[in-house]
Amino acid sequence: MDLGSGLYLPIHSTHLLEHGHAAIKRVIVVVHGSGRNGNDYFERTIAPAAAMDLLEETLIIAPTFQTSEDGPSKDEPFWTSGGWKRGHLSSSSGPSPRVSSYTAIDRILELVLDSERFPILEQVTITGHSAGGQVTHRFAGTSRIENETAIPFRYVVANPSTYLYVGSERDSQAGFAIPNSAACADYDDWHYGLQDLNNYATAVSRDSIKVQLVRRDVRILIGSADSLNASLDVTCGANMQGRHRFERGQTLIRFMDAFDPGHGHQEVIVPGIGHSSTQMYMSEEGRSALFGS
């Protein structure tokens, strides 16, 4: 994928983006987890599309955000293992200019929103599971691409470790309140909250992030059995969001209810499923979130 300025991002795609496709009605951009295995997530998103006989009208794109360990080519930007998840700029030891991982997603979306390439496009969905879910939720609050089109967008956030909070309050026995942060001074910093924003988020502004994340169509897709701590962020800022992924998803919805009852987040629980992107996306609830109305 050509990002411009001589930079390229590895992607998997069901159709050639540059040439377009006249039959495409739906675009799904799926972001991999911490393993940076975009190819696996590509296949895991194709499976439900095929099961619903929607593959011919669906363009699935799976980018790969590399680190130095992945052996990127000299014209491929790479990030730290945490940086790509948070929308940080690519490494200064990689090619120039440095680019935010979220800007790279913006470039993909700009291409697919070209009506000459995809003239009957009806829906754009950004999704990710685990670390990809973190990217999806933060991207939903910070990207301005949706504002530039009338085509509906949806963000399907599956089993992330943490979420972006648009207020400084966190859950407590007394309800949502600003915590005593003496022992956890950075609990509300980016990427948990809206303090100390990175370059990409700063360009948007806190007020705009709040409005965007509150108003957009965001599906919080959580497995009821995702209650183990494997690969879970257990820093103090993360623990203020809940004990495990399932609880953190439910708590985020309760926060949004308290913050703005007219918000666009919807809780979608997948019964009996744990931390499995394959099972989440193939479930009835997952397929409805990805392909339903």
PLM segments and residue spans:
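C-terminal catalytic histidine-bearing segment of alpha/beta-hydrolase fold enzymes
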Residues: L221, D233-V234, Q250-S293
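A domain-start/cap signature at the N-terminus of enzymes
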Residues: M1-V27, G35, N39-L59, W84-S93, ...
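Short glycine-enriched nucleophile-adjacent loop
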Residues: T45-I46, G133-E146, E284
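Cap/lid segment of the alpha/beta-hydrolase catalytic domain
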Residues: F65-V99
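Active-site glycine-rich loops that stabilize anionic/oxyanionic intermediates
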Residues: H32-R36, S161
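The feature captures the conserved acid-bearing segment of alpha/beta-hydrolase catalytic domains
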Residues: A150-A258
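Structural cue for short, hydrophobic secondary-structure segments
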Residues: I28-G33, A62, I220
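Gly/Ala-rich beta-loop-alpha elbow adjacent to hydrolase catalytic centers
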Residues: G128-G132
